[in-house]
C-alpha cells in the first residue's frame, strides 16, 4: 500500500521526488513500460501505478533486475550481515533486512536514496501499532488487532534490545544507537510489513527450507492492493516482473495483490482495509475458547460441565483446539473446517458417545469423516440441532466482544456520517463491519 510522501532527512524536501526516482530506476536497469506512470493523483492512497494507455492481459508493466533489490544480500553491509548471521537469527527472520534498512536509510550516499525519497518520513505510516492504545482498543476491540499489535510491540522491543542493540554496539563505526533508535526500528518494521516481498519457495524446497527472507522491490511496492487485482508479480532468475492479469483501461489504477488477506490483516500489516463488499477474502474469527465457554454455559449440571472439560482436553490432545486458537469463517465457508467440525461434534456428544469416540482415538469411518469435513454455508445449515445451537451461542458470545452492534455500524456507514469520521475511524469501521456481517450471516444459517 503506497504511503503519503514524507519529510526528507537531510536537505529540504523534494516537492516531487518521482522524477528522481524514475531516473534512478533507469540507471539501475529497471524497465518501465511507456504505458504506465507512477503518480500520487488518481490513486486510492498515496503513490500508485496508473495505466497511461489501454492494457491487455499478459502485458509487461515493468521488470526489476535482482541487482536493484534492497536486501541483506545487496546492501552495503552485506558481508558484515553474512558473517554475523548466526547471532542475528530471530523468530521473524527480518533482523538482517532491518539492519540493512537502518544503515541504508540513514546513509546519505546510499545507492537507494532516490528510492527512500518516496518515503521521506516513516512516521506517516498509520498502522495500528502507531495509534494510542486507548484509540486502538476503542476502535478495534473484538477484531483481534489489539492483541496482534501487543505481540508485535513486545517482539519489537525484545528483538531491538537483545539482538539489534548488541550488534550495533559491536560495530560503532557503522551504527549509532542515538541515530538508529527503537522508534526508527519500529517504523522500519512497519515499512517491511507493508512494502516488502517474500519470494515463494520452489515446491521441492517447501518441506526442507524455511521461508525466504523478505526484500524490498522498488516500483513493485508502489502498487496498491485490492482483492480483485489486475496485475501480478512474477519471479524470474534474473529479475522480478509485474504483468497484467486482466484488461486495464487508460487512466485506471493498476493493483497488485498481497495475497488472500482479511481486512483485519490488511489494517494490522498495511494500515488500510477494503470497504464492504470489496474484500471477498474477508474473514471473522470465533475464538476456540469461546466455543468452550458456550458449551459450559449450556451444561445443565456439574457432571455435564465435567464432561465438557474432558471433551476439551481430548480435543487439545487431537490438536484440534488450543487456548489461543480461532475458528476462521469466510463469506462462503469455514476455513478451519476440520477443526470446527470435530469440535462441535465432540462437544455435543453424550457421555457414552464420547467414551466410544475416545476408545477409537478420535477416528471415524471415511464416509462420516467426509460428511463432517466440509463446512460450506450449505453444510452449516444442515448441521445437527445440538451443533447448530452450540455454534449459535458461540457467535452471540463473539458479537458481545465488540463495543457496538451491527446496526450501529450501518448507521456510521451512511454517507453524511462516514465523511465526518477520521481516517482511522473509517478503516476500523471497515474491519468491524465485515466481520459482523460474516458473523450475522452465520447466525442466520444456524438459527
From Swiss-Prot:
Q: Name one GO biological process term.
A: negative regulation of NF-kappaB transcription factor activity
Q: Where is it mainly found?
A: nucleus
List keywords of the entry alphabetically: Methyltransferase, Nucleus, S-adenosyl-L-methionine, Transferase
The GO terms describing molecular function are:
protein-lysine N-methyltransferase activity
Q: Does the keyword Methyltransferase apply?
A: yes
Q: Name one GO cellular component term.
A: nucleus
Q: Which Gene3D superfamilies match?
A: Rubisco LSMT, substrate-binding domain, set domain protein methyltransferase, domain 1
Q: Does the keyword Metal-binding apply?
A: no
The Enzyme Commission number assigned here is 2.1.1.-
Report the residue ranges that make up the SET domain in this protein.
34-259
- Compartments where found: Nucleus
- At the top level, the lineage of the source is Eukaryota
Primary role: Protein-lysine N-methyltransferase.
The UniProt similarity line reads:
Belongs to the class V-like SAM-binding methyltransferase superfamily. Histone-lysine methyltransferase family. SETD6 subfamily.
- Give the matching PANTHER family: N-LYSINE METHYLTRANSFERASE SETD6 (PTHR13271:SF34), UNCHARACTERIZED PUTATIVE METHYLTRANSFERASE (PTHR13271)
What is the protein name given in its UniProt record?
Answer: N-lysine methyltransferase SETD6
Q: Which lineage ranks, top first, belong to the organism behind this chain?
A: Eukaryota, Metazoa, Chordata, Craniata, Vertebrata
Q: What would be the name of the gene that encodes this protein?
A: SETD6
